[in-house]
């Protein structure tokens, strides 16, 4: 009997993954998806002119810590193309059609609109600056800071100016205050609240402002409880600023640091659920309310572990982890993003400001009975060189003793104390359990009794159990 050779032709289906956005979460998702599915068709669309960059590093580029902005770039479009990830710059997603598994894209260079199909869609379209309603806010030389181009333009302006105005005293405003002072500019920072850095408890915010004012040396002025009502200028740019109390002063340029808002419009229009924070609602697998559609990064709300509540906290560190989780699950895997603790840190001149978990005010709003202790201690043994103070606030629940949050401010090593507390919050430790920690000690690094243990020892006396 003759041998019969059956030739079987197998059609290999290749998954088509479409990613919208490409700064942190989107770029991370693309890289992870490619590693997991070497044969998948992956397309990344962004309205930006760059992808995969550290926007958090922009204030330090403006400050002059490094001259080449390209150091902020992590992976170039060309590098992605070598891995067969197709990057479409200046192409904006304008509509998601989930019933057809399509996205309407507009090429911003040609204005051509076209449809792309997907098997899995990952939304990572980030956030955008909030532009306050101020008269003449659209004058030239009034900036926001979000993208690479913003940083380049602000730095170029700073190098030919003598005075800068910052509107907003949050993280970006405070970081730019340092940047402009280091560039030898006179700076005016205007904040509508009674203190800068209002994500901290009021007592710590006041401490931050007091310490900043103490090192001003007439290089900068912080105006609190003030609003900007009008900018004046001409076609060449802004020339002066007017406040609600009638103060008027000249300036060369302005940076608006008045917060951000998540980009959710196309998701909402597609029927994707938003969360209580107004950002896109996702589960621990980064799945949205629509099948085969995932979301990650600054456009999504997150699970705040310590209180089992929701928060919108746009940070690059979280975005990268979320992008990884979204990609794993979109590729058929099983990964969960545990949530966030609300950990953050920044610096202004010689002052470090760091926090994790809940503030005392937020804890009370969520139904806890918070108690706290604040201590000011050396960050290392007093006879060592470069010793500095840190003020540490530790917060726990009165009834259970559970640690809820911590804040640290000072010229000393505040950030490493907060990192230790973040680990404790993740583990659900009580203040008594944390006090049992065997923290490192040597004179160049910490006092015999670390400020963390000193604060927790005092706080143990304030809790019920």
What do the PLM-derived regions correspond to, one by one?
Residues 282, 296-358, 446-463:
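A conserved FAD-binding loop/helix module that cradles the flavin
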Residues 72-73, 163-165, 171-230, 315-318, ...:
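Rossmann-like dinucleotide-binding cores of NAD(P)H-dependent redox enzymes
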Residues 16, 20-24, 28-39, 47-48, ...:
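Flexible, glycine-rich terminal cap/loop adjacent to redox cofactors
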Residues 116-126, 250-259, 323, 401:
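Short hydrophobic core segments
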Residues 123-183, 221, 276-277, 282-284:
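Glycine-rich dinucleotide-binding loop and its adjacent helix/turn
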Residues 138-159, 233, 237-242, 248-328, ...:
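FAD-site-proximal beta/loop scaffold in flavoenzymes
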Residues 39-43, 84-109, 116, 183-284:
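A Rossmann-like FAD-binding core segment of flavoenzymes
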Residues 15-86, 178-203:
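Beta1-alpha1 glycine-rich phosphate/pyrophosphate-binding loop at the start
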């Amino acid at each position: 009997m003759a041998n019969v050779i059956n030739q079987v032709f197998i059609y290999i289906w290749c998954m088509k993954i479409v990613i919208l956005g490409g700064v942190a979460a989107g770029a991370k998702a693309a890289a992870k998806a490619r590693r997991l599915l070497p044969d998948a068709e992956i397309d990344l669309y962004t309205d930006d002119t760059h992808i995969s960059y550290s926007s958090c590093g922009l204030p330090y580029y403006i400050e002059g810590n490094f001259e080449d902005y390209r150091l902020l770039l992590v992976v170039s479009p060309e590098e992605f193309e070598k891995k067969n990830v197709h990057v479409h710059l200046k192409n904006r997603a304008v509509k998601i059609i989930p019933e057809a598994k399509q996205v309407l894209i507009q090429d911003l260079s040609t204005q051509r609109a076209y449809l792309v199909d997907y098997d899995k869609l990952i939304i990572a379209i980030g956030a955008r600056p909030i532009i306050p309603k101020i008269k003449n806010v659209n004058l030239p030389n009034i900036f926001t800071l979000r993208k690479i181009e913003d940083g380049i333009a602000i730095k170029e302006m700073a190098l030919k100016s003598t005075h800068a105005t910052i509107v907003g005293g949050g993280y970006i405003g405070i970081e730019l205050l340092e940047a402009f002072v280091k560039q030898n500019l006179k700076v005016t920072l205007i904040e509508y609240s009674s203190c800068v850095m209002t994500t901290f408890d009021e007592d710590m915010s006041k401490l931050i402002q007091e310490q900043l004012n103490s090192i001003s040396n007439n290089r900068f002025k912080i105006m609190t409880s003030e609003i900007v009502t009008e900018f004046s200028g001409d076609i060449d740019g802004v020339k002066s600023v007017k406040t609600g109390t009638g103060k008027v002063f000249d300036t060369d340029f302005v940076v608006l640091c008045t917060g951000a808002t998540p980009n959710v419009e196309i998701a909402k229009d597609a029927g994707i659920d938003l969360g209580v924070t107004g950002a896109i609602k996702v589960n621990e697998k980064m799945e949205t309310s629509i099948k085969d559609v995932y979301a990650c990064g600054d456009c999504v709300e997150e699970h705040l572990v310590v209180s089992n509540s929701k928060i919108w906290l746009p940070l690059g560190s979280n975005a990268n982890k979320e992008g990884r989780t979204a990609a794993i699950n979109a590729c058929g895997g099983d990964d969960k993003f545990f949530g966030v603790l609300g950990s953050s840190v920044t610096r202004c001149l010689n002052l470090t400001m760091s926090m994790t978990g809940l503030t005392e005010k937020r804890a009370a709003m969520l139904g806890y009975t918070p108690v706290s202790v604040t201590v000011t201690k050396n960050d290392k043994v007093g006879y060592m060189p470069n010793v500095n103070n840190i003020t540490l606030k530790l917060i726990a629940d009165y009834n259970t003793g559970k640690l809820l949050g911590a804040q640290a401010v000072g010229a000393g090593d505040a950030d490493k104390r907060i990192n230790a507390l973040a680990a404790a919050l993740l583990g659900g430790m009580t203040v008594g359990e944390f006090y049992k920690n065997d923290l490192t000690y040597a004179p160049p690094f910490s006092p015999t009794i670390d400020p963390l243990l000193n604060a927790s020892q005092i706080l143990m006396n304030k809790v019920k159990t």
